[in-house]
Structures are given as C-alpha cells and as structure tokens.
Amino acid sequence: MDPDPRRWPGLAVLLLAAFMDFVDVSIVLIAAPVIQADLGATYAGIQWMLAGYALAFGLLLITGGRLGDLVGRKRVFLIGVAAFTVASAWCGLAGSIGVLIAARVLQGAAAGMMVPQVLATIQVSFPRQERPKAYGLYGAVAGLAFSAAPVISGLLLQLDLFGLSWRPVFLVNVPVGLAAFVGAALLVRESRADVPPATDLAGIALSSAGILLLLYPLIQGNDLDWPLWAFAMMAAALPVLALFARYEARRERQGGLPLVPMSLFHQRSFSAGLLCALVVYSAVASFFFVLVIQLQAGHGLSPLQAGLITVAWPVGIGITSNLAVRLAGRLGRRLVSVGALLVIACMLLLVATIQGGEGDLDAWQVMAALLLGGLGMGMIAPILVDIVMSAVPPCDAGAASGVTNTVSQIGAAVGLAVVGALFIAFLHGQAAPAVDAVTPQLRADLATAGVPAAAQDELVAAFRRCALDRAEQQNPPSCQPQPAAQAADGASFTTAPAVRDALVRAGEAARREVFDRAAARTLWYAVGAFALAFLLSFALPPRVRRDEPQPAAVSA
C-alpha cells in the first residue's frame, strides 16, 4: 500500500484527539475537590467519578483496538471521538454526582475506542523509516498533556468562565472534539485488516474479566484501605488472564481470528518492550502523583503554579525525542538505557533538593531536575513504542496498539497503588520526626513572644498532639491548635498575636517537613523502577530493523 500523502496532517488530527484524552485524565483529578463541593458529593462518589473512567478505558482498549482492525480504524476513531465529545458535554451539564459518574463511564469507554487507533494508524500509514518520528511526536504530545493538565485546570478554575466553576474542565473538550472529528473525516485515510470480520466474544469476555479483576482493586485499594477481597481479586486475575492467553493461542492455531494474536508475544521486540513499558509507566505516573501532591498540599502552591513548574518535563521530552528518532537506527536500545539513567539522575537530584532544602523548595532546582528527566524520557518513549510495534504486521496493528495502551494503563495503576500506599504510610510515619524538627524554632518564637518555659511546654505538647492527630488523616492540613496555656492572670497565651503567629508558622513548617520527608522517601520507588528499566533495556533488540517487509492492508 502506498503511503498516505495526507499522513502528516492526519497525524496532527490524531494527536489532537490523543492530547484531549491525556489531558482529561489529570485535569479532572485536579478539579475533583471543587466538583465535590459544588455537587455535594460524598468522597465515595468522587472516587467513582475517577475510577469509572479508568475502568471503562482500561476494559475497552484491547477490544477497541481489534475492532479498528476489523471494521476500519478511521471509522472506530470517529465513533470514539464523537462519543467522547458528547460524553464531555454531558459531564459539563451534569447536575448530580450520579449523572456525572455515568457520563464519565461513557467518556472512558469512548476513549478506549479512540486512543488505540492512533498508534495503529501510524503503523499502517507511515513507511518504516518515518514511524520513529511519528512515535516521537506521539510521546511528546503525551508528555506535554500530562504536564500541561495542571496549568489548564488551574487556569479554567481560576478564570471561572461565565460563572460555570468546574464545568469548563469538561466543556473545553467539545470544540476540540468537534475539530478532531472534522479533521479526521477529511484527512485520515481508512484502513483495516485484509481478513473477514469475526467477533471473538469469548476472548473479549475473558480479557475484560481479567483486566477488571486486576484494575479495580489497584484503582480502589488505597481508598478502601486494602481489604482482603482486593488481594483475592488480583490473585483471581492471574488464572483468568492465563486462560485468556491459552484460548487465544488455540484459536490462532486453529485458523480463527483471535482478539490478541499470541504470536505477537513470540517477538522479542514486542514482549520485552511491553515489559519495559510496564515498568517505565508505573514509575512516571506515580512520580507525578507524588510531585503534584507535594507541591500543592505540602507547599501550598496553586494548581497553576505547580503546573508551570512541571512543564519543564515535556520541554525536555521535546528536545530529545526528535534527536532520539534520528539516532535510533544507529543506537537502538542504547537510547533507552541512557534515557533511564538520565531519569534516575533526575529523581536523585529531586531527592537531594527536597532533603537539602529548608522551608520552601527552590522552584528552579526542581525545574532543572524535571528538565533532565524529560530529556531522558524523550529518549525512552518514542524508541520504546517503535521497538514494541516494529514486528507487528499492519493487520494486527489495532490489537497490538490496544495491548500496548492496556499495559501502560496497568503499569500506571500498579505504580499509583504501590506509591499511594507508601506515600500515605510515610506521611503517617514521618509526622513525629517532622514535629521534632520544627519544635526548636517554635520554642524560640514562643520565648521571643514572652511565653514562660512552663507554658511553652504545654503549648508545644498540645501542638504535637494536634499535629500527630492531623497526620492520621489522608491529607493532613497545617495544625493551629488551641491549647489552654494560661498566664498568671488567667489570660490564654493563644490570644496573643505573636503566639498565634508562631503556632501558625510552626504548623505550616511541620506540614512542609512531613510532605518533604514522605516525598523524598517515596521517590526511591521511581529510582528503583527506572533502574529496573535500565536492566530490562538490555533484553530489547539491539536495533530496530528498517527493511522488514510490509504486509498489505486494505484501504477504503
């Protein structure tokens, strides 16, 4: 099949839709507190608003990808974009949390149909030598979207357009979705596998059951304090997924059309690349989770301020992704190895910055570290996708894309589950050391305010009790206790402005200290994950072949 002459404008349209979806994942998380207050939703309701999207998205990625192979990738993409746009409008108009949850589930399902078509269309529309550049653009857009989400969310919430509060967070997708739909209809060429359509219902059922058993406890486990049934579900996922793999392999041997061809996993580039991607995306998702919480809850930055700091990451990706694509033919997997080392250096620099700082973080140091990490990720993302997809025939492009996106989703869920549990545990465990660290300054401030030693002891003890009690909460705020320390004439010392100011400063300092300590310790997960990715990079093929034959695909 001749290359599509409109493939580059068409790719811009596909990436616009992908950007819309990637931003939506994070932008809603940032707006969740405002949504909860406006709709009077319970904490469980907000969790289902977030989890419903993630579950529907994860469940339909493989099915949506294979459906594109069979009935047309452009057709499925257009259906997904249209449904995503309608669901976004429904979210923005929702008057209750129940309606919003239903709309979010539809939105996630639509994204599961839409997103796999992006990589699949790149695979069938671009010649072998152009694909790394296209994958590099895809990786850069993904990195930009995840980092730009706090900026976009912060701006929309701060501007409060037309007095709509949080609703523009969803409604902004409507014009973007319409533009993507029209652009795809005009610029993207239809393609599908040269095989008769056949629905693998058993494969769909088994894969959906296995992914649901795995993803649901990973998404909800931390919020429910990891009940026994969560571990039982994850354990049950293993035999279900094993049965799915066995069934698909048998169907393929018998000449049927499987949902996921197991022969893909016989390719070293596909299986090793997916394993490396699983580890990488578990680290990236959890890293930004910790960083954003630390900047906002720990240091009191607004979503907009935090987002402006994290923009350094996609800037780094943009710098190296194009260079990595040019060097891919000569360096191959070594780019992934070097990129992993750069990201490890980024994490270590962040740990040193957090542990070495006193009071507020140096934003420039954080941005420098993130720029370094982005440079590394720009070497990893496009090359890893190119390696994974390199041995995939066009007839299986959608299935492979769905599997690739599902693995990334599972990796992110695993990373968030592990790091979420670690972060909460460290917040609780580091509360006492954090209070101890700020106590000398609190005593000095109280002495300056004229508080006698005995009253200082009482104030400090009450402050400590309050701070430790607050640390047991999921999101501990600063502590300004109201102890009953009394002067000799019976007046409370806490009524003195200098004393109250000292307690407020100590509370804010303790909050920063406990979040810094927890974040620094939790970041070691990302260090370990990228160290593992570095080792796994040696299992990848040394280079991606550029001269492989191109199986034909039907174009309509």
PLM ranges: what are they?
Residues R73-I79, L335-V338, T522:
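Juxtamembrane helix-start motifs in multi-pass secondary transporters
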Residues A87-G92, Q107, A184, L349-V351, ...:
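MFS-fold secondary transporters
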Residues Q158-L275, A283, L301, I309:
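Hydrophobic transmembrane-helix bundles of small-molecule transporters
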Residues K133-A142, S147, V366-R465, R521-L523, ...:
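Small-residue-rich alpha-helical segments with characteristic i,i+4
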Residues M1-L186:
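Transmembrane-helix bundle of Major Facilitator Superfamily
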Residues M1-G10, D386, L442, L446-A556:
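Transmembrane-helix exit segments and adjacent C-terminal regions of multi-pass membrane proteins
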Residues W8-A56, A232, A249-A399, E548-P549:
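Transmembrane core module of solute transporters
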Residues I35-Q36, L67-G68, I152-L161, L218, ...:
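Interfacial helix-cap and linker-helix signal at transmembrane-aqueous boundaries
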